[in-house]
Regions:
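Transmembrane alpha-helices and adjacent helix-loop boundaries
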Residues: 24-261
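Intrinsically disordered, low-complexity segments enriched in serine/proline and basic residues
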Residues: 1-10, 14
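Short, Lys/Arg-enriched N-terminal segments with co-localized hydrophobic residues
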Residues: 11-27
């Protein structure tokens, strides 16, 4: 009796397996095979031959490029925005010339692709890919930061500056102590969005052989014949952007609390 029941169970199991196979249902064996292949591919593109070190080096290059370019962009942006602000009401030839030069800079940089600017910086101005990247990304970001800051300054009520001057403050002190602190609160979201965009724009640094995160991931993809490194790079970029967004929201909350306080 037991033998007959066991044989019947085997027949039912085989019939169910054939039915699942015919209907396209995944089997446990296929699941474990797929999982094993996935883990094997992950090992091949991360641990094998210490490739995780290459990801870290590429990540370090990406962060360094973005951080240095961000500093250059902020310096250029503040300078250009202040020049355009002060030169707007001046009638002298010198101020008009400087204002026109700043306007041309913003128009040209914003109107041409970053890849073209990067190639020009590498082939004409610099011999090293790192220096060319920092310069190109910084100059590119400066044009956008300048417009963001200029818009923030313009959003402040002119009466604020007049009140500062009525208190005996110089034009520079009024800008530094009254206008700019209020403008920063208004432009903070747009400024952080520009920094996030700058971080992602560094992914084209590989055009001039800079081994950033994207370039390293693509190199490993070519060696391992596997597209997983590109997904790993995408996940790392996503984590960086999420982190920057969290910092932005925290700063906005603190500024809001200081306003209420």
């Amino acid at each position: 009796m037991r033998t007959a029941r066991a044989a019947r169970a085997v027949q039912l199991s085989g019939a169910c397996g054939r039915a699942n196979k015919e209907r396209g249902y995944p089997s446990v064996e296929n699941f474990w095979n797929d999982l094993n292949k996935l883990l094997s591919d992950f090992y091949k593109v991360t641990v094998y031959k210490g490739r995780w070190v290459q990801y870290l080096e590429g990540l370090g290059m990406t962060i360094a490029l973005a951080a240095l370019a961000c500093q250059i962009g902020v310096c250029i942006g503040v300078l250009v925005a202040l020049v355009k602000y002060y030169a707007g009401g001046k009638k002298s030839f010198g101020w008009k010339t400087v204002n026109a030069a700043c306007g041309i800079y913003v128009t040209v940089i914003r109107g041409t692709p970053i890849v073209v600017q990067l190639l020009i910086a590498y082939t004409i101005l610099f011999n090293g890919s790192f220096e060319a990247c920092v310069f190109a990304f910084g100059v590119n970001s400066g044009a956008y930061v300048a417009e963001i800051i200029r818009g923030g300054i313009a959003s402040i009520d002119p009466g604020q500056a007049e009140a500062g001057r009525s208190l005996g403050l110089s034009e520079g002190a009024t800008m530094r102590l009254i206008v700019l602190p209020q403008a920063v609160k208004n432009i903070l979201p747009a400024l952080f969005n520009e920094f996030i965009a700058l971080l992602k724009e560094t992914s084209v640094a590989g055009y001039i052989a800079a081994r950033d995160l994207t370039k390293v991931s693509d190199s490993i993809r070519g060696i391992a014949f596997n597209s997983a490194p590109l997904f790993i790079a995408a996940a790392i970029y996503l984590l960086l952007v999420v982190g920057m967004t969290a910092i932005q929201k925290k700063m906005e909350r603190r500024l809001a609390q200081s306003d209420r306080g």
